Amino acid sequence: MLKNPATKYRSFKPVTLTDRQWPSRTITHPPIWMSTDLRDGNQSLFEPMDAQRKMRMFKTLVQIGFKEIEVAFPSASQTDFNFVRELIEGGHIPDDVTIEVLTQARDDLIERTFESLRGVPRAIVHLYNATAPEFRKIVFNLEKSGVKELAQNAARTMKRIAATMPETQFTFQYSPEVFSGTEIEFAKEVCDAVFDVWQPTPEHKAIVNLPATVEMSTPNIYADQIEWMHRNLARRDSLIISVHPHNDRGTAVAAAELAVMAGADRIEGCLFGNGERTGNVDLVTLALNLYTQGVDPGLDFSNINEVARTAEECTQLPIHPRHPYVGDLVFTAFSGSHQDAIKKGFAVQKPDAVWEVPYMPIDPADLGRTYDSVIRVNSQSGKGGIAYLLEQGYGVVLPRRLQVDFSSAVQRFTDDSGQEVTSAQIWELFQQEYVQNTAPIHYVGHSLSEREGRERIKLTVDIHGTRRVLTGEGNGPLDALMHAIGVPVRIQHYEERALTQGADARAVAVAEMAGADVTGSAFGVGIDANLVTASIRAVISGVNRAYARVNAQAQENFFDAAMNDAAESVGV
């Protein structure tokens, strides 16, 4: 690093705004949320999502409550074009959801973009071109007049083509790319020129998106930029001001929040901050920050673990264990003083009272998470190294969420015994908790066959002491197993690995089960020389643990499908 970085880097020039109003404002209602997970987020992946994963992500976003979703860059690839067509022709877009597509300022690309939208009831078409000095000079070799003319010509093309598609209600959006690095008077000039072409009205507004394509300054400067535009844009009553902060300086969430205070109506971003370089602004953190201030964000993260697993599986990117609200360790206290304060907070917290538990800005239960792992041991406590001991002594590598779950069991054990826990005791406790769960459903045996590309299982089990032979079909052994037992839970996460090597190798499988009536997640572990058998044992163990986590009424009907199955039934 340079001893004098000023010889290489320039500080960002602040906006002249001596009477700024945003510092005295608070956020009392949510902005319009626009997810760009399927476009900006997807294009930043090492391996972009295939059509199946994109559809899964789209449906997850709809389920969360997003009403605007940027789904593709249709002119960039046939894959993106085809995905837009599948959404439209397959009837996947709910009546209250508007899809958005992105296009550069070129006539042929704009035409291709509109072609992808034929037949859609409504859509946002998002036009952009770069306006910052380094892009004008280095990338495009254009003067300011050329940049403005490029944007206006593209706007005219969009307006002309849209007029030939009266069956679709279009909303136009314009982004001066790298707005955060553009001279603010010029950014206004280009935006005004584009909207002079489109002629939005208060009844049919256009969107002006002001992106921090590269985060270049502290969040207060970005807020000043937004407030200046909010005050000075022509046709302000006919525009929705949108922001699109990136996280290059690590302050995208703060920048977005201050931008809303400064006049922004809408925020574009991704779940958990996916996106180019350091990512887009994290919409989950933004929404839950509002929630903890008593403002309904309009997005539902009441099962945040499932959203996280979907995002991880679709993007192939892990979520950091310290990630706000969702990380595996954010509701975990290792410090003794923290543990003491949290215990005391829980002791006095009343169910219907304002949340005031120390060190916990949100109630984990509101997100579908449990209190089981809030206070747990670690190697510094004199009781821990649980995961290390299991891995070193028995070859079992626990997934992080299972580590958190199991540490609660160890904590209870050490609290009851008041003694130091040994490696052998940890292993015995682990088997009791997750491997040896044989009631109310006990695995006896199974056989598998294949028919027309689908797996069929014949499963022998004891349910509440009654032997049953169940059958099921599915895309694989576990899918067939779940169809066979017919319980009201699902496999939320599954993984497997070798426990030992060589001729007597054994496999360990871990299944994380979840269900509408199940409190938290229920883990099951299977260990067997046969990997499929290990996986079946893991799921059945997880089902037994899930059964223990539902109320008495749900338990009465838990195995109805299996008990009423027409398969063979004999007394034990």
From Swiss-Prot:
It holds the Pfam family HMGL-like. Residues 31-305 form the Pyruvate carboxyltransferase domain. It is found in: Cytoplasm. SMART domains: LeuA_dimer. GO terms for biological process: L-leucine biosynthetic process. It catalyses: 3-methyl-2-oxobutanoate + acetyl-CoA + H2O = (2S)-2-isopropylmalate + CoA + H(+). GO terms for molecular function: 2-isopropylmalate synthase activity; acetyl-CoA C-acetyltransferase activity; magnesium ion binding. Its EC number is 2.3.3.13. Residues 437-572 are annotated as: Regulatory domain. InterPro entries: 2-isopropylmalate_synth_dimer, AIPM/Hcit_synth_CS, Aldolase_TIM, IPM_Synthase, LeuA-like_post-cat, LeuA_allosteric_dom_sf, LeuA_N_DRE-TIM, PYR_CT. Mg(2+) binds at D40, H244, H246, N280. Pathway: Amino-acid biosynthesis; L-leucine biosynthesis; L-leucine from 3-methyl-2-oxobutanoate: step 1/4. Keywords: Amino-acid biosynthesis, Branched-chain amino acid biosynthesis, Cytoplasm, Leucine biosynthesis, Magnesium, Metal-binding, Transferase. Its cofactor is Mg(2+). GO terms for cellular component: cytoplasm. It comes from the Bacteria. It is an enzyme of class 2 (transferase). Belongs to the alpha-IPM synthase/homocitrate synthase family. LeuA type 2 subfamily. HAMAP family: LeuA_type2. Catalyzes the condensation of the acetyl group of acetyl-CoA with 3-methyl-2-oxobutanoate (2-ketoisovalerate) to form 3-carboxy-3-hydroxy-4-methylpentanoate (2-isopropylmalate). Homodimer. This is 2-isopropylmalate synthase. It comes from Paraburkholderia phytofirmans (strain DSM 17436 / LMG 22146 / PsJN) (Burkholderia phytofirmans). The gene is leuA.
